[in-house]
C-alpha cells in the first residue's frame, strides 16, 4: 500500500522509508546546552546516516506546578533555534500552545507540533494549518488511535496536508502510560497512510500521583524503542540530556546523551531489517 511522504526540506518522512530521528532535549535550558546537545546529535546521526531534526520546547506551558521551569519563552527560544539552524544546518521542530504563536514559530522552525493536551482545540489547529508548515500531531493520552483521523481531517480542511502523527502512549488507569503497538497501524489507516512516529521518551513517563513532577522509566527506553520501531514507522521522537538527574524537565525519561550512538545503532539495525521485508497482507 502506498505510503504518504511528507517533506521537511530535503528530508523525506514516510512509513516505508528509513526512519527520521526527531531528537534533542525536552526544553531549552540554555543556549550553551542546546548547542552542545545539538552538536552531539548531528555528529552521531551523520556518522550513522540517519536523517535528523532537532527538537526542543521554548515553553512548557503545561507543567504540573506553576513553580516548575517552563523555558526561555518565544522570543529567546526563536533566537536559539535560529542559531542552531545557522551553526549546524539542522531542521528544527518545536511545539506551540496558542494560536497567536503559530505563525511566528513557523517563520523560524521547520515543523510545528500540536501538543497532546491541545490536539482537539480547533482554533489552534486552524491557526497551525494556515501557516503551511509541516505539522506533527501528538496523539492525546485520552484519544484512541482511530479518533486521530478526525484531527487530521481538521488540518486538511484548513488546507494543510503535511501532517505527521506521533504516539506517546495511552492512559492505563491512573498515572501510568502504555503503548498499544496495534495502534500504529490504525493511525496509518485513518490518516491515509500519513507518516507515524513514536515518542518513546514521553511514553516512559510514570507520574507520582501526589507529586508535581513526572517520574520515568528511562531504564526501559531501549526495549520500548526497539519494540515500536519493529512495527515499521516513519520516525522516532527522542529526548536526551547529558545529566538526566538534573534536567529541568522529564529527566527520569531522558536517554543519557553519552548513550546516544549505541542506542541509535540498535534502532537503525531494527529499522533497516523491518523495511527490508516485502509487505505481507494477512487480511485477504
Swiss-Prot record:
<dbReference type="Pfam" id="PF00793">
    <property type="entry name" value="DAHP_synth_1"/>
</dbReference>
<comment type="pathway">
    <text>Carbohydrate biosynthesis; 3-deoxy-D-manno-octulosonate biosynthesis; 3-deoxy-D-manno-octulosonate from D-ribulose 5-phosphate: step 2/3.</text>
</comment>
<protein>
    <recommendedName>
        <fullName>2-dehydro-3-deoxyphosphooctonate aldolase</fullName>
        <ecNumber>2.5.1.55</ecNumber>
    </recommendedName>
</protein>
<dbReference type="GO" id="GO:0019294">
    <property type="term" value="P:keto-3-deoxy-D-manno-octulosonic acid biosynthetic process"/>
</dbReference>
<dbReference type="GO" id="GO:0008676">
    <property type="term" value="F:3-deoxy-8-phosphooctulonate synthase activity"/>
</dbReference>
<keyword id="KW-0808">Transferase</keyword>
<comment type="pathway">
    <text>Bacterial outer membrane biogenesis; lipopolysaccharide biosynthesis.</text>
</comment>
<dbReference type="InterPro" id="IPR006218">
    <property type="entry name" value="DAHP1/KDSA"/>
</dbReference>
<keyword id="KW-0448">Lipopolysaccharide biosynthesis</keyword>
<dbReference type="GO" id="GO:0005829">
    <property type="term" value="C:cytosol"/>
</dbReference>
<keyword id="KW-0963">Cytoplasm</keyword>
<dbReference type="InterPro" id="IPR006269">
    <property type="entry name" value="KDO8P_synthase"/>
</dbReference>
<comment type="similarity">
    <text>Belongs to the KdsA family.</text>
</comment>
<dbReference type="InterPro" id="IPR013785">
    <property type="entry name" value="Aldolase_TIM"/>
</dbReference>
